From Swiss-Prot:
The keyword Metal-binding applies. The keyword Transmembrane does not apply. It comes from Bacillus caldolyticus. SUPFAM superfamilies: PRTase-like. It is found in: Cytoplasm. One of its GO terms (biological process) is ribonucleoside monophosphate biosynthetic process. This is Ribose-phosphate pyrophosphokinase. ATP binds at residues 41-43, 100-101. Its main location: cytoplasm. GO terms for molecular function: ATP binding; kinase activity; magnesium ion binding; ribose phosphate diphosphokinase activity. Its cofactor is Mg(2+). Binds 2 Mg(2+) ions per subunit.
Amino acid sequence: MSDCQHQLKLFALNSNMKLAKEIAEVMGIELGKCSVSRFSDGEIQINIEESIRGDDVFVIQSTSVPVNEHLMELLIMIDALKRASARTINIVMPYYGYARQDRKARSRNPITAKLVANLLETAGASRVITLDLHAPQIQGFFDIPIDHLMGVPILADYFKSKQLEDIVVVSPDHGGVTRARKLADRLKAPIAIIDKRRPKPNVAEVMNIVGQVAGKTAILIDDIIDTAGTITLAANALAESGAKEVYACCTHPVLSGPAIERIQSSKIKELVVTNSIALPEEKKIDKIVKLSVRPLIAEAITRVYEMKSVSVLFD
């Protein structure tokens, strides 16, 4: 790829092998050889099957479902790479699990997003490349470099290609206004906000819509769609308020529990997601459009390896 003294080695674990292969193809390299197996009691064993001594190693692993299995795989892989004398160990986490536990929501709660950062560093990670953290301040939980990529440009390009008219970009809550504004700026559209109250986890109640949506094509945007309660209630509220069409988009399609059923029965015309998380076959429904983050991540890896600026990818 370049005349760099140290070789680039790209490895993938089990969370999103398809995306990893796509990234390797874009970069024109082969994935490194490693095996992940289980002992009879369920313990994870990893064997790196080629020399990585003195190399700059990149490991692709989202900590998606099953979150704890994938996190443990990653930590063990980092330790194996460190003991095999990798020069640098760069972790590519398209989806950073536990990111929603970024603060103490109530007394005696843990801050698990910080704990995960500590675990990655202690295991031996040199750098983290991630995509659309739930809370940008999680970058401050690390004492190693972290490159925080954005999915909005990919989503914006898709909606531009559809040539939709009278667009309004809608944030499903107050916390997502900055994200909605970034998409709105790219689409040259106004924004609206759903004012909601959440009585308990994974249960959201839509209260009010701030902004003009009647007669417009509404595009809801969030970073994560989990059980889809928030996004489907918001979509239905927008339709009831006169929106002529409702689209939704997110970077990370967790889609757990009743999410697929809720999306199918909602007013959402199309849900646009990225492949930061691998979707199983049973979740691939006609309403869901999947976009690939492979060029973005491949470019980030290349720039880090070649010691070039990554900041151009943040815009």
